[in-house]
């Protein structure tokens, strides 16, 4: 059974001032911390072990999960200095023996189907780009169509969930973001795939 890496080492600057006191994985959504939502989600798809990449307020996350009855095995990959998403995956990947694994960003709550995602190698889950603003279709200064707060058709965004082959680990930087290093290189070589999830919660 595959393992999953949760990228939870960031400081959560966009959630300040909350994250001045609580690490982003422990920020509650409907009174349940994000990290618990994620573990339940991964457990639903048969994941038996997660590796949580931490750096900021690691002890708070460890202590919280130790007090909970978590149904799957939890390990920690601790960054003494920020490594970026690529460096974090590479470091955590040393604990993975399987041929492939999942990666999920530490601030996501979703229902994207991991079984479907696992059908492809080196694949990024993508969802339709969403906006809270009305969309105008124009011809010079005339509005042809007005669409209120919805998905932008045929424009897809990275959902922050990946199914990767173990071989990618040796190509990742020791420090740096996977989105700025490996993914662009793989895309140019035709080695990076996506699976589109329409109408998924995210």
What are these model-predicted stretches?
Residues 101-102, 109, 115-118, 130, ...:
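Catalytic-core segments of class I nucleotidyltransferases/pyrophosphorylases
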Residues 3-6, 14, 28, 32-105, ...:
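Conserved N-terminal catalytic core of the sugar/cofactor nucleotidyltransferase
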Residues 26, 76, 122-123, 192-194:
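Conserved beta-strand scaffold positions in the cores of enzyme catalytic domains, especially
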Residues 28, 137, 163-165:
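Short, well-ordered beta-strand micro-motif
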Residues 56, 123-140:
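Short beta-strand-to-loop element that shapes/binds the nucleotide-sugar donor at the catalytic cleft/hinge
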Residues 10, 107, 128:
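Active-site glycine-centered loops adjacent to acidic/histidine catalytic or metal-binding residues
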Residues 17-20:
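Conserved catalytic-core motifs of eukaryotic protein kinase domains, centered on the activation segment
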């Amino acid at each position: 059974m595959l393992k999953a890496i949760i990228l939870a080492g960031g400081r959560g600057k966009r959630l300040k001032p909350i994250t001045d006191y609580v690490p982003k994985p422990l920020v509650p959504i409907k009174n349940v911390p994000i990290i618990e939502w994620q573990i339940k989600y991964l457990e639903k798809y048969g994941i038996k072990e997660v590796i949580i990449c931490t750096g900021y307020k690691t002890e708070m996350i460890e202590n919280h999960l130790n007090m909970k009855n978590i149904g799957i095995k939890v390990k920690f990959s601790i960054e003494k200095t920020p490594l970026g998403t690529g460096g974090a995956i590479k470091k955590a990947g040393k604990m993975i023996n399987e041929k492939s694994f999942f990666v999920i960003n530490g601030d996501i709550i979703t229902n994207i189907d991991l079984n479907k995602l696992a059908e492809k190698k080196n694949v990024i889950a993508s969802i339709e780009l969403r906006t809270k603003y009305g969309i105008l279709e124009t011809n010079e200064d005339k509005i042809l169509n007005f669409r209120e707060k919805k998905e932008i058709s045929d424009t897809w965004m990275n959902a922050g969930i990946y199914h990767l082959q173990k071989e990618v680990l040796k190509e990742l930087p020791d420090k740096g973001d996977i989105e700025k290093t490996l993914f662009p290189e793989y895309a140019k070589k035709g080695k990076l795939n996506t699976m589109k999830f329409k109408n998924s919660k995210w």
